[in-house]
Curated annotation (Swiss-Prot):
Record keywords: Cell cycle, Cell division, Cell inner membrane, Cell membrane, Membrane, Transmembrane, Transmembrane helix
Organism superkingdom: Bacteria
Parts of the chain on the Cytoplasmic side: 28-336
Region (Disordered): 40-190
GO cellular component: cell division site; plasma membrane
Transmembrane segments: 7-27
Disulfide partners: none
Family label: Belongs to the ZipA family.
Bias kind Basic and acidic residues: ranges: 40-51
Membrane topology: Single-pass type I membrane protein
Protein name (Swiss-Prot/TrEMBL): Cell division protein ZipA
Name of the gene encoding the protein in the UniProt record: zipA
């Protein structure tokens, strides 16, 4: 007997627990459905409160709603009506879709309801001012086509500055002014012959063999035998008279700077070479004077064991001798 009573109590307790669980699930589902239904309604109400009706009318077109202020009674809902109705997710979606497609058809504000409370608390909506008849008719904005507005040109465009004249003629005239006159063909200039110098310096060098030097005593004896005399600027000169009288025909200097000699110390003197030079024109016949200078250079080179070189420090050749003679003739011709 006790076991049957215990079994009955266990079954009744299990049924009660299951009933409580089912009741809790049903209650939570109902609350969720109510929240989903009320949320879009509150959003639409808030948007209508923030946007004036005048602005909404302008978006429709030419239709204007005029009328006196009208107040509509807000619908009231009791808890019993919500208890008898069954809401599901499908019905909530259909309500959201219908309200989203026609937001202007619902002019009366919806009431807010909290399913957790026993009684519904109506929320007073702000009064909206409606112009027109007592029974306003609102046209669906999708049914009335919006007339495209064509902007007419304003008067300000009439006062625009006239288009500037094309600048091509001015550019053309400027081009005519800037265009230079055709240059006349220039006649080829006649070749100008080089002007011969009225004087020239002819130079010969007597140098020792490569790596050697010329001793002072040997050089002094050779110079005296060739008719040179020690004179001005501490160098040797060859006069018309070998004894040292008459004008100077050509002179001899040291190749090493300062180019002078010390006759008193010739025994201690040595040099790599000496230079013989003459001015053209000179006293007497310049060609004969050059011939004498060349003979003297060859004699000194033979005495000291050196060689004769031209003004470019090259070995003397017959072609170079003819070049010297041509220079003499050019200078004499320039002074004629």
């Amino acid at each position: 007997m006790m076991q049957d009573l215990r079994l009955i109590l266990i079954v009744v307790g299990a049924i009660a627990i299951i009933a409580l669980l089912l009741h809790g699930l049903w209650t939570s589902r109902k609350e969720r459905s109510s929240l989903f239904r009320d949320r879009p309604v509150k959003r639409a109400k808030k948007a209508r409160d923030e946007t004036p009706l005048d602005e909404l009318d302008e978006g429709v077109g030419e239709v204007r709603v005029k009328g006196a202020r009208s107040q509509q009674n807000e619908p009231s809902f009791s808890s019993s009506s919500f208890d008898n109705a069954s809401f599901d997710n499908h019905s909530a979606r259909e309500e959201l879709r219908s309200e989203a497609t026609s937001p202007f058809e619902h002019l009366s504000p919806a009431s807010s309801y909290d399913p957790l409370l026993d009684e519904a608390t109506p929320v007073d909506s702000p009064r909206s001012q409606v112009r027109g008849d007592s029974n306003p008719q609102v046209v669906n904005p999708r049914e009335t086509p919006i007339q495209p507005s064509i902007d007419t040109p304003r008067e300000s465009f009439a006062y625009d500055a006239p288009p500037s004249a094309p600048q091509q003629p001015a550019a053309h005239s400027l081009h005519e002014k800037v265009q230079p006159a055709p240059a006349q063909p220039q006649q080829p200039a006649e070749p100008v012959e080089p002007v011969a110098a009225k004087e020239a310096v002819l130079v010969l060098h007597v140098v020792a063999h490569q790596g050697g030097v010329i001793g002072g005593e040997l050089l002094l004896q050779s110079l005296l035998q060739a008719g040179f005399q020690f004179g001005e600027m501490n160098i040797f000169h060859r006069h018309v008279n070998p004894a040292g009288a008459g004008p100077v025909l050509f002179s001899l200097a040291n190749m090493v700077k300062p180019g002078s000699f010390n006759v008193d110390a010739m025994s201690e003197f040595s040099t790599p070479g000496v230079s013989i030079f003459m001015m053209v024109p000179s006293y007497g016949d310049a060609s004969q004077n050059f011939k004498l200078m060349l003979q003297s250079a060859q004699r000194i080179a033979d005495d000291v064991g050196g060689v004769v070189q031209d003004d470019e420090r090259r070995m003397m050749t017959p072609q170079k001798v003819e070049s010297y003679k041509a220079r003499i003739r050019d200078v004499l011709k320039a002074n004629a």
